[in-house]
Amino acid sequence: MKKGHKTHLGAIILALLTLFALAPQVKAQQKDMPEVTIATAVSNLAFAALWVAEQLKYFEQEGVRAKITVAGGGSPCQSAVVGRSVNFCASSSEGLVLAYVEGAPLVAIQSHNRALTLSVVIRKELADKFKLTRKSPLNARLKALSQLGPIGATSPGAVSEQIFKFLVTKSGGDPSKLKFVYLGGPQLPASLMNNVVDAFALSPPSAEITEAAGKGYVIIPLGLGEVPELTDYPYEILMARPDYVEDNRKVATAVARAISRAGALFHSKPEAAKAALRAHRFSNPKTLEDKVFELSFDTVKPAIPRWGNMSSEGWKKVINFAGGAGIIKDPAKVPSAEEGLLWTNKFVGKP
């Protein structure tokens, strides 16, 4: 064997020995990391930044091991945090406002979105009848909502109901004339495709599934930021007990930064973020067909902020929406939108 070959082979052997020697050390370091539990309200793509952070192991890179579960709704997600069975809840900001009104101890430390991510979908034949597309003037699309029959929603008072009332009011319509059918989230796509309801609004991919099937048409993808009152708006947020984050500042910072880094990737390297999201268990090819994933990604991407910090202006919009939705019934209980009560940037920091 030539000397050069021997040197090359020796280098390979040395590299392998080093790798094997370091493997137990890496495992030990991971074992020493604090473990945190994060519950999400649901498993849709409004939480795309969190899924990418999980897929690319950003939590481990920030120094924590994250166990992520789906709670099956915003209320059980928040209750799990309040009851200390999980450390963090990823859910909607208007839900945190409701928690405040009810006296539950929660604070937002990071924002996954900068706009509501709901997609308002109507039956395709109605979109054709009204001669509407996503390029039609927004006001024309809003006015069509007043002409609908039964509208599907997850439950009474949920954001999937309140968004229709808000948008109809915005266009000058009478929200009291809207008729809602409460079916739960998983049943809504099939209900529209079988003509049980004329419309519904959920975050991707629920509405996009109906469009890919040729039965529905998304006339208002709110994630694109067409409605000013619902843009620059912290929608899905990371919340925790105030006492927990104060007692575990490094952990809170690690989790908030991991999700924010994943969100930043959608802007700095969108194809890398897209590939990671496509590989995740909730949105891989076995779960979502290509057309549904592409529609969903295009809707969600613009709603993901460059970083997860929040502002008082954004929280004013959340509080205004919550007030209009009837979440805040007593004017004396309207919370401040300033940092320190409902939210804080002290953990998420800056890029």
Tell me what each language-model feature is:
Residues 22-28:
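Sec/Tat signal peptide C-region and signal peptidase I cleavage site
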Residues 61, 128-133, 225-231, 299-312:
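Short, solvent-exposed loop/beta-turn-alpha elements that line the ligand-binding surface or hinge
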Residues 187-280:
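Pocket-lining segment of extracytoplasmic ligand-binding domains
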Residues 246-328:
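Secondary-structure end/capping motifs
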Residues 11-21:
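Bacterial N-terminal signal peptides
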Residues 29-173, 179-182, 198-204, 221, ...:
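Short, glycine-/small- and polar/acidic-enriched structural segments
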Residues 316-351:
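Conserved C-terminal helix/tail region of periplasmic/extracytoplasmic solute-binding proteins
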Residues 2-13:
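Bacterial N-terminal signal peptides that target proteins for export
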